[in-house]
């Protein structure tokens, strides 16, 4: 099954709007086992749309067009497709009722061209638009490709696709199979290294499929399985996840497409009823603020300091931090932080003097992390960063969060991979 995705809109061609719709749909199609080998953008010109359709019809089984369903003069997608497949356009009565009701409610006379939005391909299926007026269409052909038409605004397209199109495609093309996706999240390992470690599994594993995705501070693996029931599909994913984590489990921190490292740490702190205090000389309170956004209990954060002078009888400038005394100083600072603020956990983050590495604004910064708890567990680690200072700070925030997570999960520290 091959699908082709075509975005329609002159504003896309001119770079005035970034097209987020095509990648969103392509990822979802891949998860369903429907591959998209061709994608394109075409302006709102009837001749250009028709030329693109002729090419797509020769090489694809499903042609997906996004945009051009509105009331404007250059919203021509439905009209060109109806001409191409020799079908009429008819109004969707429910959508027309919604459109008229809205105009009555705001006491505005409806312009005639608004009527175009509620038209869909005759003998096709109208697709409901919960956040707009432009109706989508799904049309199955007996002797050519099928057509799927959706509105261009992402806030209309995404809900339509998720709520109505995905179930429709599953019924039409998956033949009773159920899809289940599982997202696994990893921190402290790069995509290239992770892919290398699980490469044999990725090659041999066909159900579920495995795809990796590099985020700014982490890597995710998406597993997508097909089975005759939701329970069987979920079981396939869980078995594959267990195999993956025998290889890279040291870096695994959680499941879920909308999960995050700070959410996991916040949950662990609250579940274990632990309070934490921090001295952030390098990150200047950003670990606390990041964590605070994920916490439901504000008392979990016992407070903190952005400098060492409040805890030591020296100013920050008078303390010379180096590899010789970094571990000792950050350990002492974590202990003092915990004691002074009466927390279960004390965390300290310090950095050695940065050095320019001669590349733009990049600087080499070695950062020390220390964590101490009432259980007399002491974790100390250091990491070198070599981006611009702000990026180094952002990276350090997540290293600190992972240190807290490893303490609460009773996991050992591992080297960055």
From Swiss-Prot:
Concerning SUPFAM superfamilies, the annotation shows: CinA-like, Molybdenum cofactor biosynthesis proteins
Q: What name does the UniProt record give this protein? A: Putative competence-damage inducible protein
Q: What is the lineage of its organism?
A: Bacteria, Bacillati, Bacillota, Bacilli, Lactobacillales
Organism, as annotated = Leuconostoc citreum (strain KM20)
Gene that this sequence comes from: cinA
Q: Family assignment? A: Belongs to the CinA family.
Q: Which domain of life is it from?
A: Bacteria
